[in-house]
Amino acid sequence: MTDIRTFLKTGEPLLFDGAMGTHFAALPGRAGERCELGSLRRPEEIAAIHRAYLEAGCRAVKTNTFTVSLDLARGDGETAERIVEASCRLARACAEPYGAYVFADIGPAPESRLLPRAENYCRQADLFLDRGIRHFLLETLPSDHGLRQLAQHLKARCPEAYLITSFAVSFDGATREGDFGQTLLRRSVALEEIDAVGFNCVSGPHHLLEYIRGLDTGGATLSVMPNAGYPTVQGRRTVFQGTPEYFGQKIAEIVQAGASIVGGCCGTTPAHIAGAAEALAKPRRVTAAASSGAAPEPRGSVSANTLAEKLDGGRRVVAVELDPPTD
């Protein structure tokens, strides 16, 4: 398999899979069941989800281990180790025929008297390294607490390891712990042990696209994995708005805005990743003006104001207010 650093130098975006929990919860009788335990109890279902994403066109899959941090935080190292063991085995077996990369998926660790965040992350890194995993995604982070220690520990044990750190920011750029994405990105870029940095979860593709357009990434390799959209509750089920086609279009725009690594978070399914793969396979669109050689319209040009025309003409106007957030 091509070294991941070599792959990224080709300029081709690395497309990750989407949400494991969303797909697992949609299976009959699985709503409310912890999907990480599925690696132990229902391995055939977890493997089927991995393969569905690979068939959709992703080039990297995450191990089914997002909440292992919680097991370690409450002192249940045995369950954590069993989940990591089974999840690594499943992800590797599924990814190998497709030539896809396998990333250790590490979710946010809670603050705990029993186990500080830094130690939690380092213990997880050891579990994955001991099983031959060399690619790591630390995702949905509300802060960078413990990040420096993890990055240094990881590279001390395995210098060739590849580490992506990804923060969860709302559309205004803040995390739930009050940190700002730009600050977290800047501090992460300053750590030479971190290979890529970015954002995932909380926000839909439109808002993450608009957010990264205003960022100074400092030349970092940028990773962006938005939610499918924003959740609503329909018949006791959480449903995310946004079609796979729309998601794919926005992922392509996110790549054009500078991201090298993309994928999906909450609410995304193999259909969303297929939409992204299809959109990324298309050549960049060329505007009609550019293709015809016509001069672009001056920025100062004035277009017709249909609202003003209706008001001036005494016609009735209907105003509609949409509840934020929208995507």
Segments and roles (model prediction):
Residues 1-327:
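Domain-level signal for soluble alpha/beta catalytic cores
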